[in-house]
């Protein structure tokens, strides 16, 4: 095998993430440039870190890295409850995990990941989310494990360096952009080194992998690029996997927001609204991470959409938005719909119809509450539009009224009608506030307004301190 082809990159998300972690640890731009000498050096780093974590006292920060290993490799030599706590005795067992394949000694099998010749078979204790050695019905016929070549074995144990890890789970990235994949791995290698030195107590409690992905995408590309996050725990009794994805146009949306002050203002308003504090004033949910999560759609459908969250903010009467704030949030919603969903919307005539009807009523607040209740329901909205259209006609409206032909995209049960109705509400709320119709129960706080204006001058998708981590060099291990 040539010097620059010692490590393959496959389509398997865990092996792929591990291969990029190996490249980051070796200081290479991509896994294709990893040499046999690099594999040796990375193997030595992994062995040293595993042994140190597995033999560390429970009250030390090093033990936090053992928790990571336990979540990924239960019952391995490094995590078994009956393991030795003598580093000298444990080291040979860990080194043996990454021993050279010796095809001359017997039968060779194609590696499960890259199809290279392999003489070692592994099962769940060493491979996250794979079957145990007892599940012979799911394993290759007559083989008590999955064949794994040396390069892929090292990659699978370098995985936690390139993943976003917690004490109980790991998150890896699959991405069409190699630049984003490399950036994600490098940031997480730095973070992993910090966990080993300071433990999880030394890390921001509200940080999330989605924030790191958005920062990587922002720096990598402005074109089309799909990303997938795989979050999992390789538990003995109840392993689980959660998959979330971004749409391919999200990088274009990020670039548009980052280059536009009103959109940055809208994003920072969204972040601030999602920040949560406990009774002592400590942050328990970071707004940056929670906002980033809205751009990821769960495979099982259990995720909050960005447009839905923006609608809740604009419809909540307890929130005090200035005209500028409301315009920024509405513009953010329209930009997302246009950039990510490819929606072309001209809702101003219908929005004007509803705003006129609300404003000209004897109780604008009452009519607004009526519209708020009907806004997302196709049937209720259709009924309200008929009512508004008829009332304004009877009152002798001097402006042209949007007729039923313009209502169709909003009240039919068709693709993107729900999103259209949310955007309509956003535009109606902006028109009402521009006209001075009271919407919220509170007035906007001038101090908060100044803070948001200052935030709007900053990048929207910064790495939130990840770039401040010192670069890790293998010589420090």
Regions found by a protein language model. Name each.
Residues 65-207:
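Basic, glycine-/proline-tolerant helical and adjacent loop/strand elements
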Residues 6, 55, 136, 158-159, ...:
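Intrinsically disordered, low-complexity boundary segments flanking structured domains
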Residues 1-109, 175, 179-191, 234-237, ...:
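N-terminal alpha-helical interaction blocks
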Residues 199-446:
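Intrinsically disordered, low-complexity regulatory regions
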């Amino acid at each position: 095998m040539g010097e620059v082809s010692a490590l393959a990159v496959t389509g398997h998300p865990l092996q792929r993430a591990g291969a990029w972690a190996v490249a980051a640890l070796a200081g290479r731009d991509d896994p294709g440039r990893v040499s046999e000498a690099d594999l040796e050096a990375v193997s030595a780093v992994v062995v040293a870190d595993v042994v140190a974590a597995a033999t560390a006292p429970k009250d030390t920060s090093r033990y936090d890295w053992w928790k990571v290993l336990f979540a990924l490799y239960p019952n391995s030599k490094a995590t078994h409850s009956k393991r030795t706590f003598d580093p000298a005795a444990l080291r040979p067992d860990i080194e043996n995990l990454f021993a050279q394949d010796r095809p001359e000694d017997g039968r060779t099998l194609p590696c499960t990941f890259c199809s290279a010749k392999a003489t070692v078979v592994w099962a769940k204790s060493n491979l996250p989310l794979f079957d145990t050695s007892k599940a012979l019905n799911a394993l290759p016929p007559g083989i008590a494990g999955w064949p794994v070549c040396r390069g892929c074995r090292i990659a699978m144990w370098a995985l936690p360096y390139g993943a976003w890890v917690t004490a109980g789970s790991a998150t890896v990235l699959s991405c069409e952009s190699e630049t984003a994949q490399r950036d994600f791995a490098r940031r997480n290698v730095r973070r992993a080194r910090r966990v080993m030195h300071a433990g999880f107590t030394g890390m921001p409690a509200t940080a999330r992998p989605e924030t790191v992905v958005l920062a990587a995408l922002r720096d990598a590309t402005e074109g089309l690029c799909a990303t997938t996050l795989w979050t999992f725990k390789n538990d003995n009794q109840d392993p689980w996997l959660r998959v979330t994805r971004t749409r391919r146009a999200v990088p274009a949306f990020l670039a548009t927001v980052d280059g536009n002050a009103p959109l940055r203002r809208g994003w920072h308003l969204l972040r601030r609204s999602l920040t949560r504090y406990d009774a002592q004033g400590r942050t328990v949910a970071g707004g940056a991470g929670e906002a980033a999560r809205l751009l990821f759609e769960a495979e099982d459908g259990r995720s909050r959409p960005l447009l839905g969250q923006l609608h809740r903010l604009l419809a909540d009467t307890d929130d005090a938005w200035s005209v500028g704030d409301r315009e920024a949030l509405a513009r953010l919603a329209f930009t997302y719909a246009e950039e990510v969903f490819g929606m072309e919307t001209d809702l101003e005539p219908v929005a004007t119809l509803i705003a006129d009807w609300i404003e000209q009523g004897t109780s604008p607040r009452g009519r607004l509450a009526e519209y708020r209740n009907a806004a997302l329901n196709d049937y209720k909205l259709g009924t309200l539009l008929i009512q508004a259209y008829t009332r304004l006609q009877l009152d002798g409206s001097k402006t042209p009224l949007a007729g039923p032909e313009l209502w169709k995209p909003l009240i039919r049960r068709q693709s993107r009608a729900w999103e259209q109705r949310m955007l309509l509400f956003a535009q109606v709320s902006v028109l009402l506030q521009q006209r001075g119709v009271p919407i919220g129960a509170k007035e906007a706080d001038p101090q908060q307004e100044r803070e948001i204006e200052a935030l709007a001058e900053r990048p929207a998708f910064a790495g939130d301190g990840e770039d401040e981590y010192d670069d890790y060099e293998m010589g420090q291990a």
